[in-house]
Amino acid sequence: MPIYKNGIPQSPGLLSLLMVSNHENHDLLNSYPVSEWNGGKVHFITPSIIHLMRGQVYKIGDKTFFTMGGAESHDKIYRKEGVSWWSREMPSDDEYEEGLENLNKVNNQVDYILSHCAPDQLQEQIAYWYKHNKLTNYLEIVRQTVEFKDWFLGHYHIDKDFGKYHVLYQNIIELGD
């Protein structure tokens, strides 16, 4: 039987890491105090639920992860600001800059990149009708300048691999060595 505290399930021994997409309540997430965890900034939602913030590099076990969550909503005209759409769905200039600085600190080498949307070149293959924006442009720069083993992303509601790029929707994967 699950244990709940303030309506949030508590899972002793299980750690859940989350990264923002575009439909999260960014105001609520950003109301949590910023802490440091495994080399990067986080919000502890509970001791076992951790929000991995944008532009951070984390060392988890012997692997390094770069995170840049967020995306532009293509349906925001049907949504209500502060209820089903948040202006903070896209990263800020400070988050973009901090991300590049953090990547520079690790010599532009990480094991994994986690993002919600794709870099420009990949997005053209996945959803050519989506317009490029500041975030997809930024991720294209990351793609061209950072060495990585695999890149995992969501946003497009498909499960499909494009070489070392993995678009996840319903699939659950296990990271290997």
Regions found by a protein language model. Name each.
Residues 35, 83-84, 149:
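Short, low-complexity intrinsically disordered segments
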Residues 111-156:
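Cap/insert and terminal regions of metallo-dependent hydrolase folds
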Residues 1-60, 128-139, 144-145, 170:
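Core catalytic region of metal-dependent phosphoesterases/phosphodiesterases
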Residues 1, 22-29, 58, 73-76, ...:
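Active-site environment of divalent metal-dependent phosphoester hydrolases
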Residues 16-17, 65, 151:
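Hydrophobic/aromatic residues located in beta-strands of well-ordered beta-sheets
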Residues 40-42, 47, 60-130:
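Active-site-proximal loop/helix segment associated with metal-binding centers of metalloenzymes
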Residues 59, 140-145, 156-177:
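Binuclear metal-dependent phosphoesterase catalytic core
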Residues 20, 55, 69-71, 155, ...:
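Residues at the C-termini of beta-strands that transition into short coil/loop
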